[in-house]
A protein has these predicted regions:
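Glycine-rich phosphate/pyrophosphate-handling loop used in enzymes and phosphotransfer proteins
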Residues: 1-193
Length: 193
């Protein structure tokens, strides 16, 4: 048995022990699922997939989402975002990667995320959009690129009534990190909601 075989076997044993101690759960209904599954069969059938309505054109580009933000999807995303429940990340990343591949194909040069402010990062302990971008990147074996920095701690978007108020709320809230590295490139910009 070579060193790489031994490492592979140790990784399998470690993963098996983790699955035994912390069984994987469906992020949408909390039901136990197999160690290689990302979602339970029931949720896979009944989730509110966006299907052929995944993409919407905006004044600054196209946006896409694999699922409608309602019921179990909303709960799972909020549990991830505000309670730090990371178990759903592989599922969220897989669904988002599949949606992005179908809707945007190779129309981007790199993947980035919408960062949180330093204040929210300290309070929450993690940047949920960065984690989501990272889980999507795992599917494609690439690394997300940091392109933006949030420079204003503006009010949360969730408390705003309409698209105009949300647009005004983020105006001037971000700056480019190393603008010379991103000039002329197209990015898949990942956010949680």
């Amino acid at each position: 048995m070579g060193m790489s075989d031994l490492n592979e076997r140790l990784n399998q044993l470690e993963q098996g022990a983790l699955n035994f101690l912390f069984p994987r759960r469906c992020p949408f209904c909390n039901q136990h699922i197999g160690s290689k599954e990302l979602i339970c069969a029931g949720c896979e059938k009944k989730l509110p997939y966006t299907g052929d309505r995944a993409v919407r054109q905006t004044s600054w580009g196209r946006v896409a989402a694999p699922l409608y933000y309602e019921d179990a999807v909303r709960r799972a995303i909020l549990d991830f975002k505000f309670k730090g429940r990371m178990g759903g990340l592989p599922c969220f990343g897989s669904l988002t990667a599949r949606c992005a591949a179908e809707e945007f194909g190779g129309e981007f040069d790199a993947i980035t995320w919408v960062p949180v402010s330093r204040k929210r990062l300290r309070k929450r302990g993690f940047d949920q959009a960065r984690y989501l971008a990272g889980s999507l990147c795992v599917e494609w074996h690439v690394e997300p690129q940091e392109t933006l920095r949030k420079i204003l701690d503006n009010p949360p978007q969730s408390g705003l009534e309409d698209a105009d108020a949300r647009r005004a709320n983020v105006l001037g809230a971000y700056e480019a990190v190393h603008p010379e590295r991103i000039a002329g490139k197209r990015f898949l910009l990942v956010d949680d909601i």
